[in-house]
Swiss-Prot record:
Annotated family: Belongs to the DMRL synthase family.
Organism of origin: Aeropyrum pernix (strain ATCC 700893 / DSM 11879 / JCM 9820 / NBRC 100138 / K1)
UniProt entry keywords in alphabetical sequence: Riboflavin biosynthesis, Transferase
Any single Gene Ontology cellular-component annotation: riboflavin synthase complex
UniProt cross-references to InterPro entries, sorted A to Z: LS/RS (IPR002180), LS/RS_sf (IPR036467), Ribfl_synth_arc (IPR006399)
Pathway: Cofactor biosynthesis; riboflavin biosynthesis; riboflavin from 2-hydroxy-3-oxobutyl phosphate and 5-amino-6-(D-ribitylamino)uracil: step 2/2
Record's protein name: Riboflavin synthase
Catalytic activity annotation: 2 6,7-dimethyl-8-(1-D-ribityl)lumazine + H(+) = 5-amino-6-(D-ribitylamino)uracil + riboflavin
Gene: ribC
Keyword Transferase: yes
GO MF annotation terms: riboflavin synthase activity
Amino acid sequence: MGKCVGVADTTFARVDMGSVAEEVLRRRLPGYRIVRHTVPGIKDLPGAAKRILSMGCEGVITLGWVGRREADKLSYLAASVGLIMVEVLTGKIVIDVTVHEDEAEAPEELAAIAVDRARKHAENLAALIREGPEALVKHAGMGLRQGYPDAGPIK
């Protein structure tokens, strides 16, 4: 099959974060095939991630959107636990990117958060695949943020 990396996203999301991640991964991982799997909602992401990794992909980025209701937040919790299980059981990289609809009131601000977060985490996934587990060590403790301005380190 050759080298591949996965993108799993949802139709529930209000921003096409999957395309943002795909663009970054194509640029940062030339020669890799990108497998994209779009599912209805956030609780479907663990299964999608597992299917992608079962195809021989080295890692996957999952892009979820959480609504404002309490039920949505509980669904996120279930999905998050599922994604952690996939990562632990497969031993492969799973980068969970999530936007919570109550992070901002204005749709434009939510869109900016989603795009920034998807882009930065896709960069993280590409670095981990290219350079291995020490790829992000140089950024440890630097207060980097995805979706917001970096906070910086506390010295």
